[in-house]
Regions:
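Glycine-rich, mobile lid/loop segments that gate access to catalytic sites or pores
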Residues: 1-96
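Glycine-rich anion/phosphate-binding loop at the beta-strand->alpha-helix junction
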Residues: 5, 73-190
Length: 191
């Protein structure tokens, strides 16, 4: 920890100097959904000051109640984390083997509890038409932006300048006190 702290602070300072902001909130936990990002920059700033990273504090209280209930029963809960990166320059990534989604997914799936990763609309895009999913480009105060951000800030494996939106499904911790079935390897029997 002591060795990684200076590196984390240096990275944070470097990102801030490039006007890149990163923030994560608990989108879903213990059956309760938090609000989605709306005023991204303001919400990113406020999330960094919170002990329990949610946008809607009332939803956070409900999550905590459900977490405590599961813990009292010797169980655990999973959830979904939503991360947003703003200020990422256009052109980060590669279209083929080092796509931005591929590189980020590789890192995220290296966390053992992460069981699913999606960008932008993710799995919801399976129910959309191409005309709905496509992020149309437009000029806004002289800048090229997209009207929607269904692709989560990435087109063809490369950042497009819109906020990068990533969701991770995190499984409930398997280290629980609730009795469960297992196998006795020595005697070769179920226990």
């Amino acid at each position: 920890f002591l060795l990684s702290l200076p590196l984390a602070l240096a990275k944070s300072s470097m990102l801030a100097s490039k006007n890149i902001k990163i923030g994560t909130h608990i989108l879903k936990c213990a059956g309760v959904f938090d609000d989605s990002f709306k005023n991204i920059d303001d919400e990113l700033d406020s999330l960094n000051d919170k002990a329990f990273a949610v946008i809607n504090d009332d939803k956070g209280k409900q999550m905590i109640e459900n977490i405590e209930k599961a813990a009292a029963e010797g169980d655990s809960v999973g959830g979904i984390l939503e991360t947003v990166v703003t200020g990422l320059p256009v052109g980060v990534g590669e279209p083929w083997f080092d796509s931005l989604e591929g590189v980020l997914s590789h890192g995220l799936f290296s966390i053992p509890a992460v069981k699913g990763v999606e960008f932008g609309q993710g799995f919801n895009c399976a129910d959309m038409l191409g005309s709905e999913m496509n992020d149309s480009f437009k000029l806004d105060n002289g800048e090229i932006v997209t009207e929607t951000n269904n692709n989560g800030g990435i087109n063809g494996g490369i950042s497009n300048g819109m906020p990068l939106v990533i969701k991770c499904a995190v499984k409930p911790t398997p280290s629980i006190s609730k009795e469960q079935n297992t196998v006795d390897f020595i005697n070769k029997e179920n226990t």
